[in-house]
C-alpha cells in the first residue's frame, strides 16, 4: 500500500516541502531563521486576531481600547505584549536571515532573493501601520512624519499624501485604513512566503560552503525538523523573557500618552528596527534626497546579485570580504544607535559618515574585495 503522505494531493505538497525534502547535510544554525520567521508570522497573526476582537479603529476610542485590552480582557496584557515584542523578534530574525543570505551568497537564487526583498518591504509596511494603531503620541507623530515624506515626490507629492491621509491631516480616515491594511498585509506576507519557498525548492538550499550539495543530501525530517524545534524553543524563550520581564524595554514611553495633534514630542523616532533607515533619512539635508536614500537603503539588496564579482559563492573562504561584511554589520548597529539620538552635534556627522559608509561598503568595497580575492587565488 502506498503511503497517504505521498499520494494525497495536499499531504504530498507538505511532504515534499517539510518531510522528504532533500536538504544539504551541512547547513548550520544560520539556516534556522526561515522557519523561525514562519513561527513569528503565525504568532503575529494569532495574537493580532485576538487583539482585533477588542480593538476599535476610531480616533476617539483607539487608545482607550488598547488600555481596555491590557486592563480588562482576560490575558489581554500578555496578548498585547506578545504582539508588540513579537514584531521585534520578527525583525531580529529577518535581519539575521538577510545577513545569512549576504554572507553565504544565497542571493544568487535570484527569484527567491527578490521575493524575499518584497517580503521585507511588506513586513516593514505592516509594522509601521501597526505602530500607528494604539494612537499614542509616537503613533500619531510617527504616522505624520513618515507619510509626509511622500510629499517630497515632485508634482504629485502633496495630492498623494492627502489621498493616503484621507483628509488634510492624519485623522480618523487614516487610522481606519491603516487598521484595514495592517489586518490584510500579514496574509499577503503568508502568501508571498509560500512563493518564496516555492522558488527555493526549485533550486534546493544553499549551504555554508557555497558548493553544490547534490552529492550529499539528507531528508529534512527528522534531521532539520528537530533542529527547527530547538530554534523555535529558543525564540519563544527569548520572546517570553522580554514579554514577562521587560515588556516596555523596546517601546517608547511617549506612546503611553494619547495622541495630541497640538503637542509635538521633543524626539520623534520609530521603533528600534527602523532606526538604521531613519538615520540614513535624517543624514541628508534635502527632503527628496533623504527619501530616496531611505528607499535605496533597502532596495540596494536587489542590486547585490549584480555586484557579486567573486569566483566563489560563499564568504566562508574569503577573509577580506568577511572583514567588510562585519564592518557593514557594525555600521548598521552604529546607524541604529544614531537613529535614536537627537539631531545635534556630534550625532549628525556620525550619522552622515555611517550612511556614506553603508552605501560605500555594499556598492564599492565588497565588489573590489571580491576582485582582489579572485586575483589572490592565482598566487
Curated annotation (Swiss-Prot):
Heme b b566 binds at residues 97, 196. GO terms for biological process: mitochondrial electron transport, ubiquinol to cytochrome c. Binds 2 heme b groups non-covalently. It comes from the Eukaryota. One of its GO terms (molecular function) is ubiquinol-cytochrome-c reductase activity. CDD domains: cytochrome_b_C, Cytochrome_b_N. PROSITE patterns: CYTB_CTER, CYTB_NTER. SUPFAM superfamilies: a domain/subunit of cytochrome bc1 complex (Ubiquinol-cytochrome c reductase) (SSF81648), Transmembrane di-heme cytochromes (SSF81342). GO terms for cellular component: mitochondrial inner membrane; respiratory chain complex III. Coiled coil: none annotated. Keywords: Electron transport, Heme, Iron, Membrane, Metal-binding, Mitochondrion, Mitochondrion inner membrane, Respiratory chain, Transmembrane, Transmembrane helix, Transport, Ubiquinone. It is found in: Mitochondrion inner membrane. A ubiquinone binds at residue 201. Component of the ubiquinol-cytochrome c reductase complex (complex III or cytochrome b-c1 complex) that is part of the mitochondrial respiratory chain. The b-c1 complex mediates electron transfer from ubiquinol to cytochrome c. Contributes to the generation of a proton gradient across the mitochondrial membrane that is then used for ATP synthesis. Heme 1 (or BL or b562) is low-potential and absorbs at about 562 nm, and heme 2 (or BH or b566) is high-potential and absorbs at about 566 nm. The cytochrome bc1 complex contains 11 subunits: 3 respiratory subunits (MT-CYB, CYC1 and UQCRFS1), 2 core proteins (UQCRC1 and UQCRC2) and 6 low-molecular weight proteins (UQCRH/QCR6, UQCRB/QCR7, UQCRQ/QCR8, UQCR10/QCR9, UQCR11/QCR10 and a cleavage product of UQCRFS1). This cytochrome bc1 complex then forms a dimer. This is Cytochrome b. The gene is MT-CYB.
Amino acid at each position: 500500500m502506498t503511503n497517504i503522505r505521498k499520494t494525497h494531493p495536499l499531504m504530498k505538497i507538505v511532504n515534499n516541502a517539510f518531510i522528504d525534502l532533500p536538504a544539504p547535510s551541512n547547513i548550520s544554525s544560520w539556516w534556522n531563521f526561515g522557519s523561525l520567521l514562519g513561527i513569528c508570522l503565525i504568532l503575529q497573526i494569532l495574537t493580532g486576531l485576538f487583539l482585533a476582537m477588542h480593538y476599535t479603529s476610531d480616533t476617539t476610542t483607539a487608545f482607550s481600547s488598547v488600555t481596555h485590552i491590557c486592563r480588562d480582557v482576560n490575558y489581554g496584557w500578555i496578548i498585547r505584549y506578545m504582539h508588540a515584542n513579537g514584531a521585534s523578534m520578527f525583525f531580529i530574525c529577518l535581519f539575521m536571515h538577510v545577513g545569512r543570505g549576504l554572507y553565504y551568497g544565497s542571493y544568487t537564487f535570484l527569484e527567491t532573493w527578490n521575493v524575499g526583498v518584497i517580503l521585507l518591504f511588506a513586513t516593514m509596511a505592516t509594522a509601521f501601520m501597526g505602530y500607528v494603531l494604539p494612537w499614542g503620541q509616537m503613533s500619531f507623530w510617527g504616522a505624520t512624519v513618515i507619510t509626509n515624506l511622500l510629499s517630497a515626490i515632485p508634482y504629485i507629492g502633496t495630492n498623494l499624501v492627502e489621498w493616503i491621509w484621507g483628509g488634510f491631516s492624519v485623522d480618523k480616515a487614516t487610522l481606519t485604513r491603516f487598521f484595514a491594511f495592517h489586518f490584510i498585509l500579514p496574509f499577503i506576507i503568508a502568501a508571498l512566503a509560500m512563493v518564496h519557498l516555492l522558488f527555493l525548492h526549485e533550486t534546493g538550499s544553499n549551504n555554508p560552503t557555497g558548493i553544490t550539495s547534490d552529492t550529499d543530501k539528507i531528508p529534512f525530517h527528522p534531521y532539520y525538523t528537530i533542529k527547527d524545534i530547538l530554534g523555535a524553543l529558543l525564540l519563544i524563550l527569548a520572546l517570553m523573557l522580554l514579554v514577562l520581564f521587560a515588556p516596555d524595554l523596546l517601546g517608547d514611553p511617549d506612546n503611553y500618552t494619547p495622541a495630541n495633534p497640538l503637542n509635538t514630542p521633543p524626539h520623534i523616532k520609530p521603533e528600534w528596527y527602523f532606526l538604521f533607515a531613519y538615520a540614513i533619512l535624517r543624514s541628508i539635508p534635502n527632503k527628496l534626497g533623504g527619501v530616496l536614500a531611505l528607499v535605496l537603503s533597502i532596495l540596494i539588496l536587489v542590486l547585490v546579485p549584480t555586484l557579486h564579482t567573486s569566483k566563489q559563492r560563499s564568504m566562508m573562504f574569503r577573509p577580506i570580504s568577511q572583514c567588510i561584511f562585519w564592518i557593514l554589520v557594525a555600521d548598521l548597529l552604529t546607524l541604529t544607535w544614531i537613529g535614536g539620538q537627537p539631531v545635534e552635534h556630534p550625532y549628525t556627522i556620525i550619522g552622515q559618515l555611517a550612511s556614506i559608509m553603508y552605501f560605500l561598503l555594499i556598492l564599492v568595497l565588497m565588489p573590489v574585495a571580491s576582485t582582489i580575492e579572485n586575483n589572490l587565488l592565482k598566487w
